[in-house]
C-alpha cells in the first residue's frame, strides 16, 4: 500500500513541476531568460534550444541580451525568436541580439492572469484525476483481498492528504504568479 501512496505523491509532484515550467513561460512584463525556453533554432539541420547556442543575460529589467557562441548563428536565432511569436521584437547588430520586453498594459496583465488561472485549474484537475486513479487502485486491491478495509480507509485518507497538499501548493504558485503579473 505504501507503494500506492509513494506513486500518488510522485505523480502529483510531476504535475506541480509541469505547472511550474508552464508558469515560468508566462511573462510578467519583465525580462527573463525563461521567455526563450520553448524557442528552438534549426542549427546545422538539428533543432537546438537557444540556451545551448548562446548566453542569455538580463542587464536591465526590460532587456534581454543574447550572445551567440557562434556568430554565424545570429540570424538563425533571430528568425527563430520571431517565429516563436513571443510578442517581442528582437534587434541584432550582427554580434548580439537584444530583445526589449514591452511593459504590459492593464488589459494584457488581466489576460495573463486568466491564462495563469486556467493553467492552474488544469493542474488541479490533473491532481484530482491522480487521486481518483489511486483510490480506484486501493478499492481494487481491497476487493482482491490484497489489503484490509482498514488499510483501504487509511490509504484513502493518505491519498486525500497528498491531494490537499498538492492543491494548496498549486494555489500558492498561482497566487504568487498573479501577484508577480499584477505588480507594475
Swiss-Prot record:
Listed NCBIfam families: frr
GO MF annotation terms: ribosomal large subunit binding
Region entry Disordered, spans: 134-167
GO terms for cellular component: cytoplasm
Protein purpose: Responsible for the release of ribosomes from messenger RNA at the termination of protein biosynthesis. May increase the efficiency of translation by recycling ribosomes from one round of translation to another.
UniProt family annotation: Belongs to the RRF family.
Localization (cell): Cytoplasm
Assigned keywords, A-Z: Cytoplasm, Protein biosynthesis
Gene it is expressed from: frr
Originating organism: Staphylococcus aureus (strain NCTC 8325 / PS 47)
PANTHER family the UniProt entry points to: MITOCHONDRIAL RIBOSOME RECYCLING FACTOR PSEUDO 1, RIBOSOME RECYCLING FACTOR
Principal location class: cytoplasm
Matches recorded under InterPro entries: Ribosome_recyc_fac (IPR002661), Ribosome_recyc_fac_dom (IPR023584), RRF_sf (IPR036191)
SUPFAM superfamilies attached to this UniProt entry: Ribosome recycling factor, RRF
Superkingdom classification of source: Bacteria
Gene Ontology biological process: translation; translational termination
Protein name: Ribosome-recycling factor
Amino acid at each position: 500500500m505504501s507503494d500506492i501512496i509513494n506513486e500518488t505523491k510522485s505523480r502529483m509532484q510531476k504535475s506541480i513541476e509541469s505547472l511550474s515550467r508552464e508558469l515560468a513561460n508566462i511573462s510578467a512584463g519583465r525580462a527573463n531568460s525563461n521567455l526563450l525556453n520553448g524557442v528552438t533554432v534549426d542549427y546545422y539541420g538539428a533543432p537546438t534550444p537557444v540556451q545551448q547556442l548562446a548566453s542569455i543575460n538580463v542587464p536591465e529589467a526590460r532587456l534581454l541580451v543574447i550572445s551567440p557562441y557562434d556568430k554565424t548563428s545570429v540570424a538563425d536565432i533571430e528568425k527563430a525568436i520571431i517565429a516563436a511569436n513571443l510578442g517581442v521584437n528582437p534587434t541584432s547588430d550582427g554580434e548580439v541580439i537584444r530583445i526589449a520586453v514591452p511593459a504590459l498594459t492593464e488589459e494584457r496583465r488581466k489576460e495573463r492572469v486568466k491564462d495563469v488561472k486556467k493553467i492552474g485549474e488544469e493542474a488541479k484537475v490533473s491532481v484530482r484525476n491522480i487521486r481518483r486513479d489511486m483510490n480506484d487502485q486501493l478499492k481494487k486491491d481491497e476487493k482482491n483481498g490484497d489489503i484490509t478495509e482498514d488499510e483501504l480507509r487509511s490509504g484513502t485518507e493518505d491519498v486525500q492528504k497528498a491531494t490537499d497538499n498538492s492543491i494548496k501548493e498549486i494555489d500558492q504558485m498561482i497566487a504568487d504568479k498573479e501577484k508577480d503579473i499584477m505588480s507594475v
